[in-house]
Amino acid sequence: MLHRYLPMTEEDKREMLKVIGVDSIDDLFADIPESVRFRGELNIKKAKSEPELFKELSALAEKNADTKKYTSFLGAGVYDHYIPVIVDHVISRSEFYTAYTPYQPEISQGELQAIFEFQTMICELTGMDVANSSMYDGGTALAEAMLLSAAHTKKKKVLLSKTVHPEYRDVVKTYAKGQRLCVVEIPFQNGVTDLEALKMEMDEEVACVIVQYPNFFGQIEPLKDIEPIAHSGKSMFVVASNPLALGILTPPGQFGADIVVGDAQPFGIPMQFGGPHCGYFAVKSALIRKIPGRLVGQTSDEEGRRGFVLTLQAREQHIRRDKATSNICSNQALNALAASVAMTALGKKGVKEMAAMNIQKAQYAKNELVKHGFHVPFPGPFFNEFVVRLEKPVAEVNKRLLEKGIIGGYDVGRDYPELQNHMLIAVTELRTKKEIDTFVKELGDCHA
């Protein structure tokens, strides 16, 4: 049988063996002692035709719990959002289908312009001056922000709010360990950073203060109150933010943030089992030469035509490895393109409307749950996620919800022992009133 990906015929094999000077394929392994050779049949299924294989893999895929078959109220950093149809069409074009920013930019003007537009839109959302072409994800972007802060201030202490996503905090701690930085976690009160505890830890040795906006619990951190505390010790103010929320919230840049990072997954990137995603990284203009990753700039050629180039490349490892501001080379250019196309398709008004729908639907879900006797421990304003307290273990409740065709919320107790039996519920613009009402009813039944 001639296989599509193994096109060699028996005649081809005989000809190759003849040229090599052996009689059979077994002769190629003559140097391997008989005592260590495997004898018998390998535990491998027989070959199948493409239609047979397609049916088998489709049957396996049908066993997956995805958002096409289940209604999802799970968020915690990865969200079920609307993706405009045009996104997949554009990113599937052969000119774009790569994770790399090009090394020969003059022959990739279309790709560079798309990345330039991504950078521009991130700056508009965050209120910052400069954004790079992308990072791996939100967690690594935040860790790189910490490293930039430490290098810029020449200080070793990092104040990290416990309301920052637990996985982001783990990545930050991993990076900090290698650089011998001291990470101090700031506790929370009523679901937001404890300002008094933050003041107590502030001193002249602090490189940066890190908060999330909205934070892991969905709460809106009081950036206006945090900023003067963060800058009191000549430290840097770093904010990790959901870019969709910035479509309606005041951008961190207007509160005096020095670095704003986050994950662009809400724009055009599927949930896809948690990755790959696309981190973004934006800074004030004073930090432009210390920002990690690639930067696309706009210029003019000698004939006055607009063009795009990779600029300030001396920061990068392929130019000066020992003095590079980061070692990111390949990045998430394809996902950055997806985010750029999604934001363009939605437009400023569409992004704002989408963000408003998240707030409205999440607020409706919270109010309905409160009506049905659920306790919401954090009273402050939130974006599209909120925490509720259950009477039973979250894992047990989620198992029962799954049987009803619902993917329940995140078990907060996994990361916060003091919040056992608390569920983080995400409600995006895709959830209908009927789906929310059904979820409230089923959660109430599980709760009883």
UniProtKB/Swiss-Prot annotation:
Record field: catalytic activity: N(6)-[(R)-lipoyl]-L-lysyl-[glycine-cleavage complex H protein] + glycine + H(+) = N(6)-[(R)-S(8)-aminomethyldihydrolipoyl]-L-lysyl-[glycine-cleavage complex H protein] + CO2
The organism's place on the tree of life at top rank: Bacteria
Any one GO molecular function term: glycine dehydrogenase (decarboxylating) activity
Subunit structure: The glycine cleavage system is composed of four proteins: P, T, L and H. In this organism, the P 'protein' is a heterodimer of two subunits.
UniProt record similarity statement: Belongs to the GcvP family. N-terminal subunit subfamily.
Protein task: The glycine cleavage system catalyzes the degradation of glycine. The P protein binds the alpha-amino group of glycine through its pyridoxal phosphate cofactor; CO(2) is released and the remaining methylamine moiety is then transferred to the lipoamide cofactor of the H protein.
Name the UniProt record assigns to this protein: Probable glycine dehydrogenase (decarboxylating) subunit 1
Organism of this sequence: Geobacillus sp. (strain WCH70)
Lineage of source species: Bacteria, Bacillati, Bacillota, Bacilli, Bacillales
